[in-house]
């Protein structure tokens, strides 16, 4: 059988179309994966630059200014430098625990981004147990730090890992009780439902005004969970060299560096979602596209504005932990544990009882 030239061309074009369809299918599968990763990376770089600029202003010195415009690429330059440094392993340590520890710390924090809503329809996983899943996932990170400290075969590293575990346990309970109070107020543990419950009453419906005591306890507990000054005892330079990070170098040291800022960003995002109304601004911006007769863009416009509002609230709140790091002295270990067990735990329990009583009386 003889096949004409046009038929051969049609067959070739059809095969090329099938190949292109497969390529586009793979690309569209990868887009939802790489988009959050890119967003998180840019967010961390912005936090590092913001902290360096604020700390420079507090200390009356010049911040980074050579790597990129206004020094915004300095963190990227530091990360690139760490990539090319030698990865050292302790000769007498447990190399498996030493290598796995940083990965556990980073992955447990990255998983928390699954339940953070940037809009009513823009959340990777809207679960009924969203906020408690975050607490459960964040409890895994200290295990990685303890593994790193033990696997290093270094007394300073091991002591830093023990401090990280003790600090996490002490402040995880008040944090959980504050989240439980928010869940009772909103009648849901879903992060999307919590934001929508606040948006019903506008600006004065934010949980910041309905739960001021819980907000303060949550703020202090989240700072302790992030190991930020004045709660950075697991890596206190004057006492433990660098804590559980002492024996690390290269990319593994960089993972701890990234995990610290990832945790700070997650905590700030959850403060925005739980207490500051999330993507809600109490201004009817959704009617702007209708005013300009571009109704088809209304949903896209609303989603874009929601992302912008959430990030704006988050980065404005970041001024608090950044400022406290460069203005407050470090606590002693006994002071840190006393604050968690003797003050924050009873206060958070009392706040939970008040919230429960008010909810029962309102039935």
Swiss-Prot record:
Signal sequence interval, chain numbering: none
Annotated localization: Plastid, Chloroplast thylakoid membrane
Primary residence: plastid
Matching PROSITE patterns: COMPLEX1_ND1_1, COMPLEX1_ND1_2
Keyword Transmembrane applies: yes
Membrane topology: Multi-pass membrane protein
Superkingdom: Eukaryota
GO biological process: aerobic respiration; photosynthesis, light reaction
UniProt-listed InterPro entries: NADH_UbQ_OxRdtase_su1/FPO, NADH_UbQ_OxRdtase_su1_CS
GO molecular function, one term: quinone binding
GO CC terms in record: chloroplast thylakoid membrane
Reaction(s) catalysed (UniProt annotation): a plastoquinone + NADH + (n+1) H(+)(in) = a plastoquinol + NAD(+) + n H(+)(out); a plastoquinone + NADPH + (n+1) H(+)(in) = a plastoquinol + NADP(+) + n H(+)(out)
EC number in record: 7.1.1.-
Family: Belongs to the complex I subunit 1 family.
UniProt function note: NDH shuttles electrons from NAD(P)H:plastoquinone, via FMN and iron-sulfur (Fe-S) centers, to quinones in the photosynthetic chain and possibly in a chloroplast respiratory chain. The immediate electron acceptor for the enzyme in this species is believed to be plastoquinone. Couples the redox reaction to proton translocation, and thus conserves the redox energy in a proton gradient.
HAMAP family: NDH1_NuoH
Subunit record text: NDH is composed of at least 16 different subunits, 5 of which are encoded in the nucleus.
Protein name: NAD(P)H-quinone oxidoreductase subunit 1, chloroplastic
Organism per entry: Vitis vinifera
Organism ancestry: Eukaryota, Viridiplantae, Streptophyta, Embryophyta, Tracheophyta
């Amino acid at each position: 059988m003889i096949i004409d030239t046009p038929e051969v061309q049609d067959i070739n074009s059809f095969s090329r179309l099938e190949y292109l369809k497969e390529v586009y299918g793979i690309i569209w599968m990868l887009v939802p994966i790489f988009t959050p990763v890119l967003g998180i990376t840019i967010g961390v770089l912005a936090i590092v630059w913001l902290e360096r600029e604020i700390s420079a202003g507090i200390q009356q010195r010049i911040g980074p200014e050579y790597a990129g415009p206004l020094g915004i690429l300095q963190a990227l330059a530091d990360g690139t430098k760490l990539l090319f440094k030698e990865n050292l392993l302790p000769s007498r340590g447990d190399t498996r625990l030493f290598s796995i520890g940083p990965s556990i710390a980073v992955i447990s924090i990255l998983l928390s981004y699954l339940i953070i809503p940037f809009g009513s329809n823009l959340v990777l996983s809207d679960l009924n147990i969203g906020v408690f899943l975050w607490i459960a996932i964040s409890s895994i990170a200290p295990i990685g730090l303890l593994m790193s400290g033990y696997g290093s075969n270094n007394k300073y590293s091991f002591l830093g890992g023990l401090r990280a575990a003790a600090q996490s346990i002490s402040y995880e309970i008040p944090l959980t009780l504050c989240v439980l109070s928010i869940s009772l107020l909103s009648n849901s543990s879903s992060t999307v439902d919590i934001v929508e419950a606040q948006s019903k009453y506008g600006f004065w419906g934010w949980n910041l005004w309905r739960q001021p005591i819980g907000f303060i306890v949550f703020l202090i507990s989240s700072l302790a969970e992030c190991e930020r000054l004045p709660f950075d005892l697991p890596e206190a330079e004057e006492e433990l060299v660098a804590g559980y990070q002492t024996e690390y170098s290269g990319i593994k040291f960089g993972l701890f560096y990234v995990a610290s800022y990832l945790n700070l960003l997650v905590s700030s995002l959850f403060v925005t979602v739980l207490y500051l109304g999330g993507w809600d601004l109490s201004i009817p911006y959704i009617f702007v596209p209708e005013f300009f007769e571009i109704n088809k863009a209304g949903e896209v416009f609303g989603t874009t504005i929601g992302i912008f509002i959430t990030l704006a609230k988050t980065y404005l709140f970041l001024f608090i932990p950044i400022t406290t790091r460069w203005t407050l002295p470090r606590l002693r270990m006994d002071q840190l544990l006393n604050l968690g067990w003797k003050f924050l735990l009873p206060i958070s329990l009392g706040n939970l009882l008040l919230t429960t009583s008010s909810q029962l009386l309102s039935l």
